[in-house]
Amino acid sequence: METDLNDYTVIKEGEAEILMHKKNQVFFNKAQVNNRDMSIAVLREFLSKRKQEHEAKSSKRTRPASKVIEKDASEASKEETPSENGMNNGDHEVASEDGPSSVSKDPAKTTERFAPREPKPPKVLEALSASGLRALRYAREIEGIGQVVALDNDLASVEACQRNIKFNGSVAISKVESHHTDARVHMLTHPKEFDVVDLDPYGSPSIFLDSAIQSVTDGGLLMCTATDMAVLCGGNGEVCYSKYGSYPLRAKYCHEMALRILLASIESHANRYKRYIVPVLSVQMDFYVRVFVRVYTSASAMKNTPLKLSYVYQCIGCDSFHLQPVGRSLPKNNSVRYLPAIGPVVKQDCNHCGKKYNMGGPIWSAPMHDPEWVTSILNSVKSMKDRYPAYDRISAVLTTVSEELLDVPLFLSLHNLCATLKCISPSAAMFRSAVINANYRISGTHVNPLGMKTDAPMEVIWDIMRCWVKNHPIKAQSPEQPGSVILSKEPSHEVDFSRHIGSLSKAQAKKVARFLPNPEKHWGPKLRAGRQITSKHVSLIGHEAVNGHLSQHHEELKEEDEEAEPEDNVQDKVDPKRQKTATDNITST
């Protein structure tokens, strides 16, 4: 049965094209182009790293073979050399004929035995494919990609995906396959089969993590998105704990904490199968968080997990926070002993303002990025800018990520520090200079343009702010306010606000854009597929926010209502509020 293209709109992104039905039958979100572009960039880097690792392993395997070849060749050359006593021509000819032939055969056999095999093209699983746009872009844009398996539990989505596969031609047909099945069941029944697993659900990925971890090959790549930011950022802490096993805190760093909660949850699922993760890139963009981690199997390396997790103590009165590691290691002879961490790291009351602490976590406190990966991905993206529809955005995010302090979890907000003290804010460059002049490190964060990552302790941070307030006095406040308690103490560190050359990052010095506005209105999450689109949705969140298409049924109803209603009736209509006000005025008169 042929598809009537009049009922569809062709949407092109990158090199892929999909047919989108006007009745919102299958989910599609234009804003996720950033997500898809970033995934393609990371996947390209994964293929490159995978090839390098394979070549390195192959070279190690071929070294013994080369030594054997050299040894056989040297022995053969000795046999070929005539002795001083002399040899007859017949014997010499036989030796010369047999020697080289035997030498030439053995190395050939040895070389064949240790010949490096080319790695198989990576097999990719898109667990929740919907329209199949992501799978189609992987197949058409990434060189060397293998089979792409697209799954969905919704029959309409599978039919749409299959329709789009045919619409994209022979390359898509040969590489992409679509199945109507539960992604969890499929991943559980295909353990360690996929080199890449992509989870991009509508909401939380928590129910897919256990099966996804099992389906990734050793050294494979797991890409995971979470869009339930209200839960991850502390809006519903008990729900977050039930889904991810961590309790979130409502603070300025909540979006980075969301990333670290997701990483900790993935690590927890991996540990159940003697596996562990190595994050290569973790980003927060738009309305979601996205992590890219490699999955490895090692019972011994898995023991380091408690060293990578921490609880967070957040003061309820000021911006002070402290991290409490879950475990610690103690070297003993040639082995390592793992012990519980020593704590607590804070007193019951805050040392700075005297208020209590909230405790959250555990979160992933190890690095969220691999700097080598980030630099390589950024360079690759810049060299192929024409192939990324969202180049400006992803290059800006990667640039900021490349300048972050990797070993500093969470961050401070300069505006929040000033809000606590109720003082005017110093410039970011001045504050950074003061931290650097105190022999500490500081950087920005891709999560928040006002955020600052630093390894300076909170005592130094508050001393900097105390000295700033001394030079810029404020009005008297209630002595019970956290800001008053902090300012009542004298600084214990010398503060130097003189401009430091490192107060601006390389990107800032070159005036490279790092934080970009949304490209259009209503740039965010869209309606779930299958929901009835009404004129109310359009009036509230805009025409484009409902995938850019109103159903013909609603358009026809709207036109009929407008035609059925005479213009005189529209003019005679009175707002009930205005009518009531007018009646009250007449009564009062």
UniProtKB/Swiss-Prot annotation:
Pfam families recorded: TRM
Query: Which reactions are catalysed by this chain?
Result: guanosine(26) in tRNA + 2 S-adenosyl-L-methionine = N(2)-dimethylguanosine(26) in tRNA + 2 S-adenosyl-L-homocysteine + 2 H(+)
What biological-process GO terms show up in the record?
methylation; tRNA modification
Name the source's superkingdom. Eukaryota
InterPro entries for this protein:
SAM-dependent_MTases_sf, Trm1, tRNA_met_Trm1_C
Query: S-adenosyl-L-methionine: present as a keyword of the record?
Result: yes
Q: Which family does it belong to?
A: Belongs to the class I-like SAM-binding methyltransferase superfamily. Trm1 family.
Listed name of the protein: tRNA (guanine(26)-N(2))-dimethyltransferase 2
GO MF annotation terms: tRNA (guanine(26)-N2)-dimethyltransferase activity; tRNA binding
Q: Where does the chain cross the membrane?
A: none
